[in-house]
Curated annotation (Swiss-Prot):
GO cellular component, one term: extracellular region
TM regions (residue ranges): none
Tissue-specific expression: Expressed by the skin glands.
Main location: secreted
One Gene Ontology term from the biological process aspect of the record: defense response to bacterium
Family statement drawn from the similarity comment of this UniProt entry: Belongs to the frog skin active peptide (FSAP) family. Brevinin subfamily.
Protein name per UniProt: Brevinin-2LTa
């Protein structure tokens, strides 16, 4: 559903930011 997509996007976005700031 849409909410799952939003949550997954948020998770990947956060992980990408954390990975980028290493």
């Amino acid at each position: 559903g849409l909410w799952e997509t939003i949550k997954n996007f948020g998770k990947t976005f956060t992980l990408n930011i954390l990975d980028y700031t290493k």
